[in-house]
């Protein structure tokens, strides 16, 4: 189920405050956040936000196609290591 329209999108208050301060000062610095559930707003476009994936902060440059999605969608928590390829020489 999607979120109710009357509630509006969820954005962590500190993340929103930091992006608004960067917009006012016209500076471009990386914002670190653990809030993967925050929705990307149009005021965040053009900024780089480092989202925590459980191990490190992954820097994500926000573009206008990302508006409306959540930050956690772009910082993957699992890394797939490919399965070992079986060599024909080893089989024999």
From Swiss-Prot:
GO molecular function per UniProt: rRNA binding; structural constituent of ribosome
GO biological process, one term: ribosomal small subunit assembly
UniProtKB keywords: Chloroplast, Plastid, Ribonucleoprotein, Ribosomal protein, RNA-binding, rRNA-binding
Main location: plastid
Pfam families xref list: Ribosomal_S19
Keyword Iron: no
Annotated localization: Plastid, Chloroplast
PROSITE patterns the UniProt entry points to: RIBOSOMAL_S19 (PS00323)
InterPro entries named among the record's database cross-references: Ribosomal_uS19, Ribosomal_uS19_bac-type, Ribosomal_uS19_CS, Ribosomal_uS19_SF
GO cellular component: chloroplast; mitochondrial small ribosomal subunit
The protein's role, per its UniProt record: Protein S19 forms a complex with S13 that binds strongly to the 16S ribosomal RNA.
Similarity annotation: Belongs to the universal ribosomal protein uS19 family.
Protein name, entry field: Small ribosomal subunit protein uS19c
Naturally occurring in which organism (per UniProt): Cyanidium caldarium (Red alga)
């Amino acid at each position: 189920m999607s979120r109710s329209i009357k509630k509006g999108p969820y954005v962590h208050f500190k993340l929103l405050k930091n992006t608004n301060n960067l917009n006012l000062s016209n500076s471009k610095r990386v914002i670190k956040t653990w809030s993967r559930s925050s929705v990307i707003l149009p005021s965040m476009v053009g900024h780089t936000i480092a989202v925590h994936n459980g191990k490190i902060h992954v820097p994500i440059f926000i573009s206008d196609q990302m508006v409306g999605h959540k930050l956690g969608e772009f910082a993957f928590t699992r890394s797939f290591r490919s399965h070992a390829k079986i060599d024909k020489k080893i089989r024999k």
